[in-house]
Amino acid sequence: MAKIKIGINGFGRIGRLVARVALQRDDVELVAVNDPFISVEYMTYMFKYDSVHGQWKHHELKAKDDKTLLFGEKPVTVFGIRNPEEIPWGEAGADYVVESTGVFTDKDKAAAHLKGGAKKVIISAPSKDAPMFVVGVNEKEYKSDLTVVSNASCTTNCLAPLAKVINDRFGIVEGLMTTVHSMTATQKTVDGPSAKDWRGGRAASFNIIPSSTGAAKAVGKVLPALNGKLTGMAFRVPTVDVSVVDLTVRLEKEATYDEIKAAIKEESEGKLKGIPGHTEDDVVSTDFIGDNRSSIFDAKAGIALSKNFVKLVSWYDNEMGYSTRVVDLIKHIASVE
């Protein structure tokens, strides 16, 4: 099978990590990157040095000229174009474009990439109107006539596989989710203006910040059986990567906590292996930096109040796990074409 050729629009946290994932795989080929706000030299620096995931050590990396990055001998075309419809993805051979600016999350805005020759667009964020897919949960619902899709959010990618296992095995009556979420690039280093979210304008490295998240409700979009049964909120905390979901649910069928643990372990070692995970170790957040699984269930951290009411805890590297799923979704889409 020929390599799947991808382009990336927006070379921020997710864009750079999708590039790292793609460059280490044999089934995909990174052929182009677009970012109008940084030079090729700065792009090289930002890709090579990463405070969380460490220095890039897989290929020698250098700027060949102002329009080309070299990863070893492999050239990657670089554009610096603001308007998505003007980016010549087709000329660069990029069939699948990852829209990771965080700006063009609507279906119509993301579809502008198609005008430049892209065949499919994958939005690396939740979308209000593009169909959302979570690998390991509902990617098999994808149909080849869809040209713009969303990979949902990192938190939905953690929550949905866990919720699917619990709902399939025991049934979920209703539930509440809290994600304790590492800070992200949109937060403030010190207190600053944030008109739409006053708390979100407070210093990220100095506060625990209550925040909204649509991740739990979005599970209802990828798992219609749970539509209206889950909602949730977030606490943004002063860690730079790795987050954790606390899912508290009321079950239809009675189950002991040991039975729930066994069910999750079985699924994580079965056909979904590599997407959900399972641990019985005494872990903390930094133990999951660089983990490319979507959701790692922490068997020791959860508790049960009764056989119908339980709290389940699952970790995720909100950067690397999510970026890996973006590439996995592209691979699945290509297999359906």
Swiss-Prot record:
Instruction: Please list the residues that bind NAD(+).
Output: R13, I14, D35, R82, N318
Q: Which residues form the active site?
A: C154
The catalytic activity, as recorded, is:
D-glyceraldehyde 3-phosphate + phosphate + NAD(+) = (2R)-3-phospho-glyceroyl phosphate + NADH + H(+)
Site annotation (Activates thiol group during catalysis) points to: H181
The family database entries (InterPro entries) matched by this protein are listed as: GlycerAld/Erythrose_P_DH, GlycerAld_3-P_DH_AS, GlycerAld_3-P_DH_cat, GlycerAld_3-P_DH_NAD(P)-bd, Glyceraldehyde-3-P_DH_1, NAD(P)-bd_dom_sf
- Gene3D superfamilies named among the record's database cross-references: Dihydrodipicolinate Reductase, domain 2, NAD(P)-binding Rossmann-like Domain
**MF terms per GO, please?**
glyceraldehyde-3-phosphate dehydrogenase (NAD+) (phosphorylating) activity; NAD binding; NADP binding
Which residues are noted in the entry as D-glyceraldehyde 3-phosphate-binding? S153, C154, T155, T184, T213, G214, R236
Name the pathway it acts in.
Carbohydrate degradation; glycolysis; pyruvate from D-glyceraldehyde 3-phosphate: step 1/5
Pfam family name, one: Gp_dh_C
Q: Which residues form the signal peptide?
A: none
Q: Where in the cell is it found?
A: Cytoplasm
Q: Which UniProt keywords apply?
A: Cytoplasm, Glycolysis, NAD, Oxidoreductase
**The protein's enzyme class:** oxidoreductase
GO CC terms of this entry: cytosol
Any stretches that span the bilayer, and where are they? none
What EC numbers are recorded for this enzyme? 1.2.1.12
List the GO biological process terms: glucose metabolic process; glycolytic process
Additional remark text: Plants contain two types of GAPDH: cytosolic forms which participate in glycolysis and chloroplast forms which participate in photosynthesis. All the forms are encoded by distinct genes.
Q: Report the sequence similarity comment from the record.
A: Belongs to the glyceraldehyde-3-phosphate dehydrogenase family.
Q: What does this protein do?
A: Key enzyme in glycolysis that catalyzes the first step of the pathway by converting D-glyceraldehyde 3-phosphate (G3P) into 3-phospho-D-glyceroyl phosphate. Essential for the maintenance of cellular ATP levels and carbohydrate metabolism.
Assembly and partners? Homotetramer.
Q: What is this protein called?
A: Glyceraldehyde-3-phosphate dehydrogenase, cytosolic
List the gene name: GAPC
